[in-house]
């Protein structure tokens, strides 16, 4: 138990460090880099841990929004939660994978969402209530070197025994003196990613300016035609494969394994189409 003097000294140190950080951040810009986890390189224990991390986060989130005392809820009480099984029956499960920092963050996230809805309601907007999630897609890692850290081309995540190999580290090579901060562990239904927030000195960022002036014509047969003759066809619709998969989905029974597998294939095809769109947009921006 800290004495009153020790508490005052600790708070003073926190204020001083906070002031130093704010002064430093004023000379920096924030960038987020996204890295894809090399799932094929993960061992059995790592795959199980990452999978259950999102499953338990979903259980906790759904359990919390069903509670009446969310504002005074203690994260230390989240050792067990009640959730639904696939037959909609209530079952109690132990929380084995989600750490205390993530539990705290989930409580904070829900409280902020409720406050946001309350503000909208006071302004006259029609609002509902928070809905239960069938899938959880983002887990915040809030303290670098504790919940997560970057080591070469691999990440260390709290709770996972071995390092996790990721793809895309070369994005960082053109920057110097990077301050790594919070991160988000992401899941799009198929692949896992780590989105790492960084602060970079403004002086270390090279600004490239092009003095060329280019005219743009938006046509029908070709989406974009530049005055230098460059043409871009950025119209990407549904693929034939996606149409076939969506047609098959109608005949699948809800809740069946075959329907679940088919939904994963449809989601994967959507991701593939979105990747094509992002690739074209990046080529246009950097051309």
Model-derived regions: residue spans:
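Nucleic-acid substrate recognition interfaces
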Residues: 1-287
């Amino acid at each position: 138990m800290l004495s009153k003097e020790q508490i005052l000294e600790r708070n003073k140190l926190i204020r001083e460090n906070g002031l130093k950080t704010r002064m430093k951040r004023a000379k920096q810009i924030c960038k987020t880099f996204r890295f894809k986890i090399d799932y094929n390189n993960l061992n059995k224990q790592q795959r199980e841990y990452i999978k259950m991390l999102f499953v338990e986060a979903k259980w906790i989130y759904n359990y919390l929004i069903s509670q009446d005392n969310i504002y005074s809820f203690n994260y230390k009480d989240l050792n067990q939660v009640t959730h639904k099984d696939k037959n909609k029956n209530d079952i109690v499960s132990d929380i084995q994978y989600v750490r205390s920092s993530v539990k705290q963050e989930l409580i904070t996230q829900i409280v902020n969402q409720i406050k946001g809805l309350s503000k909208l309601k006071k302004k006259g907007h029609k609002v509902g209530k928070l809905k239960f999630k069938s899938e959880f897609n983002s887990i915040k890692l809030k303290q670098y070197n504790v919940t997560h850290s970057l080591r070469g081309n691999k990440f260390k995540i709290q709770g996972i025994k071995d390092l996790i190999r990721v793809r895309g580290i070369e994005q960082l090579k053109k920057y110097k003196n990077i301050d790594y901060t919070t991160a988000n562990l992401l899941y799009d239904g198929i692949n896992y990613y780590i989105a790492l927030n960084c602060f970079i000195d403004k002086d270390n960022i090279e600004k490239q300016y092009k003095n060329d002036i280019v005219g743009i014509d938006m046509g029908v047969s070709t989406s974009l035609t530049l005055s230098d003759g460059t043409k871009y066809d950025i119209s990407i619709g549904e693929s034939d494969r996606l149409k076939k998969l969506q047609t098959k989905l109608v005949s699948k029974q809800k809740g069946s394994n075959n329907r679940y597998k088919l939904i994963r294939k449809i989601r994967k095809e959507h991701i593939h189409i979105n990747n094509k769109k992002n690739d074209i947009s990046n080529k246009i921006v950097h051309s």
